[in-house]
C-alpha cells in the first residue's frame, strides 16, 4: 500500500512541461481530477439516488391514490347531495305553490356548501401533491449534497499529506495576517 501511495506522490513531483499525470495538489485542480471526482460521485450516488427517487415516487403515488379516494368520496357525496337536491326541488315546487321560499334558500346553501367542500378537497389534494414533491426534491438535494461532501472529504483526506497540510495552514495564516494588516 505504501508503494502505491509513493507512486502517486512521485507522480505529483514530475515536471508539468509536456507530461501527463495526476495532479496531487488539491488546490490546483485539473480536468482529470475533476472527472475522477465526478465519476466517483456519479458511480456511487446513482444507486442511492435511484432508490431515494423510487421511494419518493411511491409515496407521491400513494398520496395521489389517497387524494383520488377522497375525490371519489366527494363525488359520492355530491351524488347524494344531487339526489337530495332533486328531492328538495320537488318539495320546493310543492311549497312554491303555497308561497314558501325557505326551501329555495336551503337548496342554494346545500349547493354552495357542496361545491365549497369539493373545492376544499381539490385544494387539499393539490397542496398535498405539491408538498410531497417539494419534500422529495429537498431530500434528494440534501442527499446529493451530503454524498458530494463526503466524497470531497474522502478525496481531501486521501490526498492531504502532513507537508501539504502544513503548507496550507502556513498560507492561510499568511493570508489572515495580510487581511488583518489591511483592516488596521
UniProtKB/Swiss-Prot annotation:
It is found in: Plastid, Chloroplast thylakoid membrane. The chain crosses the membrane at residues 27-49. The lineage of its organism: Eukaryota, Viridiplantae, Streptophyta, Embryophyta, Tracheophyta. It is a single-pass membrane protein. Its main location: plastid. Belongs to the ATPase B chain family. It holds the Pfam family ATP-synt_B. This is ATP synthase subunit b, chloroplastic. GO terms for molecular function: proton-transporting ATP synthase activity, rotational mechanism. In plastids the F-type ATPase is also known as CF(1)CF(0). It comes from Populus trichocarpa.
Amino acid at each position: 500500500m505504501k508503494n502505491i501511495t509513493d507512486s502517486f506522490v512521485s507522480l505529483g513531483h514530475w515536471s508539468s512541461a509536456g507530461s501527463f499525470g495526476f495532479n496531487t495538489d488539491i488546490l490546483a485542480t485539473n480536468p482529470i481530477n475533476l472527472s475522477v471526482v465526478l465519476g466517483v460521485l456519479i458511480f456511487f450516488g446513482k444507486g442511492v439516488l435511484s432508490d431515494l427517487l423510487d421511494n419518493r415516487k411511491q409515496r407521491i403515488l400513494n398520496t395521489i391514490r389517497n387524494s383520488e379516494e377522497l375525490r371519489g368520496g366527494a363525488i359520492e357525496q355530491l351524488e347524494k347531495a344531487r339526489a337530495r337536491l332533486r328531492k328538495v326541488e320537488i318539495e320546493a315546487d310543492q311549497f312554491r305553490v303555497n308561497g314558501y321560499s325557505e326551501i329555495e334558500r336551503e337548496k342554494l346553501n346545500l349547493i354552495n356548501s357542496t361545491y365549497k367542500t369539493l373545492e376544499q378537497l381539490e385544494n387539499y389534494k393539490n397542496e398535498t401533491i405539491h408538498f410531497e414533491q417539494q419534500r422529495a426534491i429537498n431530500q434528494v438535494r440534501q442527499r446529493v449534497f451530503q454524498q458530494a461532501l463526503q466524497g470531497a472529504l474522502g478525496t481531501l483526506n486521501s490526498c492531504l499529506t502532513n507537508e501539504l497540510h502544513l503548507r496550507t495552514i502556513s498560507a492561510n495564516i499568511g493570508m489572515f495576517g495580510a487581511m488583518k494588516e489591511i483592516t488596521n
